[in-house]
């Protein structure tokens, strides 16, 4: 599943191509794309058409378009929420582009370009609704993420310190801190030298702050490299893959020597997914 850096890459691409553009038509091709919309795809099509994209925003793994009322020359109060799910792509295409068999929704812009939502596995979705304090109501419960300037890292570390549960479980909880998935949880824990199963309550505040700062640094590096792509399902708006997978130190490195000490990276099952760590550098204390 695309995590924060991958979604941010897509958001930036949409910002370049969509901000200031009016949506002249919209079509929801597959019903699952509008499964969370009370009025289904028809509601999205009717209400999205004619609105102008004022801004693109993101929180964690969710991105959205802030939509303006063209006639009123003011914000409409609506946002189009996009969740990429496991395989979703937002692609900017020319009107003569060959149709993709996994096209699920599309929006035509007033410059002639189209934005396609391509989703092979159909876990992603679009949702059009009101913004609450600038965030789509459907995801207003999602916590701030590590690249959010408004995130108070010491305060978040203090919250983690109160939890007597495994630190990785907390990092994956989108209502505590958003945008972290399996890849970046493993990478930031390796950077900080903390075992995924270490109880958060037994980690010092200083180390918890260092862990969160490491996560911010890892995600920034990933963003600079276009995100992490393991297959053709994650691409930016132009269809290009990221290459941070070449820089991973823990995730997917089972059996390879730790870049810090040379001990083979271990892999174990945790929360129905793989955890990757160094038994020497990341001891349970």
Swiss-Prot record:
One function term, GO molecular function aspect: damaged DNA binding
Gene3D superfamilies for this protein: 1.10.8.50, MutM-like, N-terminal
A Pfam family: Fapy_DNA_glyco
Subunit comment: Monomer.
Annotated function: Involved in base excision repair of DNA damaged by oxidation or by mutagenic agents. Acts as a DNA glycosylase that recognizes and removes damaged bases. Has a preference for oxidized purines, such as 7,8-dihydro-8-oxoguanine (8-oxoG). Has AP (apurinic/apyrimidinic) lyase activity and introduces nicks in the DNA strand. Cleaves the DNA backbone by beta-delta elimination to generate a single-strand break at the site of the removed base with both 3'- and 5'-phosphates.
Homology family: Belongs to the FPG family.
Name of the protein this chain belongs to: Formamidopyrimidine-DNA glycosylase
């Amino acid at each position: 599943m695309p995590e924060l850096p991958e979604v941010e890459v897509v958001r930036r691409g949409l910002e370049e191509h969509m901000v200031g553009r009016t949506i002249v038509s919209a079509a929801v091709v597959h019903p699952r794309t509008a499964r969370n919309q009370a009025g289904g795809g028809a509601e999205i099509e009717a209400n999205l058409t004619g609105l102008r994209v004022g801004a693109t925003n993101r929180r964690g793994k969710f991105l959205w378009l802030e939509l303006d009322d063209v006639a009123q020359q003011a914000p409409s109060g609506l946002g189009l929420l996009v969740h990429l799910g496991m395989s979703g792509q937002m692609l900017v295409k020319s009107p003569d582009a060959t149709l993709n068999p996994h096209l699920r929704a599309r929006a035509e812009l007033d410059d002639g370009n189209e934005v396609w939502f391509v989703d092979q596995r159909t876990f992603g979705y679009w949702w059009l609704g009101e913004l609450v304090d600038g965030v789509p109501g459907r995801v207003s419960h999602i916590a701030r993420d590590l690249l959010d300037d408004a995130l108070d890292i010491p305060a978040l570390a203090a919250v983690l310190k109160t939890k007597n549960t495994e630190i990785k479980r907390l990092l994956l909880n989108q209502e505590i801190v958003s945008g972290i998935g399996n890849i970046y949880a493993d990478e930031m824990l390796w950077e900080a030298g903390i075992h995924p199963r270490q109880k958060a309550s037994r980690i010092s505040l200083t180390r918890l702050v260092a862990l969160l700062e490491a996560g911010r640094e890892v995600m920034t590096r990933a963003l600079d490299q276009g995100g992490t792509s393991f297959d053709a399902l994650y691409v930016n708006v132009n269809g290009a893959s990221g290459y941070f997978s070449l820089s991973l130190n823990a995730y997917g490195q089972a059996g390879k020597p730790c870049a810090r000490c040379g001990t083979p990276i271990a892999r174990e099952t945790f929360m129905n997914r793989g955890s990757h760590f160094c038994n020497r550098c990341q001891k349970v204390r």
